[in-house]
From Swiss-Prot:
The chain crosses the membrane at residues 82-102, 124-144, 149-169, 238-258, 273-293. The keyword Membrane applies. It comes from Candida glabrata (strain ATCC 2001 / BCRC 20586 / JCM 3761 / NBRC 0622 / NRRL Y-65 / CBS 138) (Yeast). It is a multi-pass membrane protein. InterPro entries: Golgi_membrane_TVP38/TMEM64, VTT_dom. Keywords: Golgi apparatus, Membrane, Transmembrane, Transmembrane helix. PANTHER family: GOLGI APPARATUS MEMBRANE PROTEIN TVP38, GOLGI APPARATUS MEMBRANE PROTEIN TVP38-RELATED. The keyword Membrane applies. Its main location: Golgi. This is Golgi apparatus membrane protein TVP38. Residues 149-260 are annotated as: VTT domain. GO terms for cellular component: Golgi membrane. GO terms for biological process: mitotic spindle elongation; vesicle-mediated transport. The lineage of its organism: Eukaryota, Fungi, Dikarya, Ascomycota, Saccharomycotina.
Length: 323
C-alpha cells in the first residue's frame, strides 16, 4: 500500500537520500561528459568505479569517453569540425590505398630509404628538419623520427642524428619562448587544462627529473617545448638535462621505422605479420607507459592541491582565532 513521505521513518528517508546521492554520483561523470552539468574532468570521482566489475568499468569508461569526445567535437567551431571530418576521410582513403597498393608503396619506401641512406646530405637535412619541428606550432616530429629509423635502422648513427636534432630543437625553442615570446608561452600553458595541472607541479618542483617525467607524458612535442618556457623558475640547464636523459625513448621510433623497412624487404606473409605485430605491441607498450606516467603525475598534482587547500584552511583558522 503506497505511503506518503509523512508516514516514512527517518531511517527510510536517510536510505532514500543516500540512494539518490549514490545514483547522482555514479552518473555525474557521464553527465559531465555530455555537457549537462558537473565540474572539470580533473575532478572525477573514482569511487563511482569501486563496485563495478572489470567489464562494467571498461564499458563505463568507453561510453564516458565517447560522450566527452562527441561533446568536445560539437563545441568546436564549424571550420574546425570540417577539418576533422576531412582529416578522417583522408585517413580512410589512405588506409584503403595502403590495403590495395601496399606492395608498391612499401617498395617505393624501401627504394627511397636506401637512396637517402647513400646521400651524405641526408644527415644535415634530417637535423635541420628535426630542429625546426621543435618550435610550436610545427608538426611532423613523429614522422621524421620514424623516417630516421627507416633510413638508418636501430643504430647508434640513427639514434645520434635523432637525439641531436631533437635536443637542440627543443632547447632552442624553449630559449626563444622563454626570453623572446614569453607571453605566447604563457598562452600555450593555458591552452590545455591538463597542462595547467602539470605547470602547477613544476612550480613546486622544477627539477630536471620532474621535467623528464613530463617529457615522457603524452603531450604534443612542439607545444610542450613552448609551454614549459611559460612556467616560472625552469632553467635552460634543467630543461636541457631533462631532454638528454629521455633520449633513449627515441629508440622506439627507430625500431618502428626499421620494422617498416623490413616489411618492404621481406615479401613473405609470415614475416610481414610478425613485423606488423611487433610494431603494434611496441606502440601499445609505449602508449600505456606514457599514460601511466601521466596518471601518476596527475595523482601528484592532486596531492599538491589537497596540501594547498589544507594549508589555506589552517591559515584561515589561525586568523579567525587571532581575531
Amino acid at each position: 500500500m503506497p505511503t506518503d513521505n509523512a508516514d516514512l521513518g527517518q531511517e527510510d528517508i536517510d536510505v532514500f537520500d543516500n540512494g539518490r546521492e549514490s545514483f547522482d554520483r555514479l552518473n555525474k561523470p557521464v553527465l559531465d561528459g555530455i555537457g549537462i552539468e558537473g565540474n572539470d574532468d580533473d575532478d572525477d570521482d573514482y569511487l563511482t568505479l569501486y563496485n563495478m566489475t572489470p567489464r562494467e568499468r571498461l564499458m563505463y569508461t568507453f561510453r564516458r569517453s565517447m560522450y566527452k569526445a562527441l561533446d568536445h567535437f560539437n563545441s568546436l567551431p564549424k571550420w574546425q569540425r570540417l577539418l576533422i571530418i576531412l582529416f578522417g576521410a583522408l585517413v580512410i582513403v589512405l588506409g584503403i590505398l595502403m590495403l590495395i597498393f601496399h606492395n608498391k608503396i612499401l617498395d617505393k619506401v624501401l627504394e627511397t630509404s636506401k637512396d637517402l641512406n647513400e646521400r651524405s646530405s641526408t644527415n644535415f637535412i634530417l637535423l635541420v628538419l628535426l630542429f625546426f619541428v621543435g618550435f610550436p606550432p610545427m608538426i611532423g616530429y613523429s614522422f621524421l623520427s620514424t623516417s630516421t629509423g627507416l633510413i638508418y635502422g636501430v643504430s647508434f648513427h640513427g639514434w645520434f642524428v635523432l637525439a641531436l636534432g631533437s635536443v637542440t630543437g627543443s632547447v632552442a625553442s624553449f630559449y626563444v619562448f622563454k626570453n623572446l615570446l614569453h607571453s605566447r608561452a604563457e598562452k600555450l600553458v593555458h591552452m590545455n587544462k591538463r597542462f595547467e595541472a602539470f605547470a602547477s607541479i613544476l612550480q613546486e618542483d622544477n627539477s630536471y627529473l620532474m621535467l623528464a617525467l613530463l617529457r615522457l607524458c603524452p603531450f604534443p612535442y612542439s607545444l610542450t617545448n613552448g609551454a614549459i618556457a611559460g612556467i616560472y623558475g625552469i632553467s635552460v640547464k634543467n630543461f636541457t638535462i631533462a631532454n638528454i636523459i629521455t633520449t633513449p625513448k627515441l629508440l622506439i621510433y627507430l625500431f618502428i621505422g626499421a620494422r617498416i623497412k623490413n616489411m618492404a624487404e621481406d615479401h613473405s606473409t609470415s614475416s610481414r605479420i610478425f613485423d606488423l605485430v611487433s610494431i603494434l605491441i611496441t606502440l601499445i607498450i609505449f602508449t600505456l607507459t606514457a599514460w601511466l606516467l601521466y596518471f601518476k603525475t596527475k595523482q601528484r598534482y592532486a596531492q599538491l592541491k589537497n596540501q594547498a587547500v589544507a594549508q589555506n584552511s589552517s591559515a584561515n583558522r589561525e586568523v579567525d582565532f587571532e581575531i
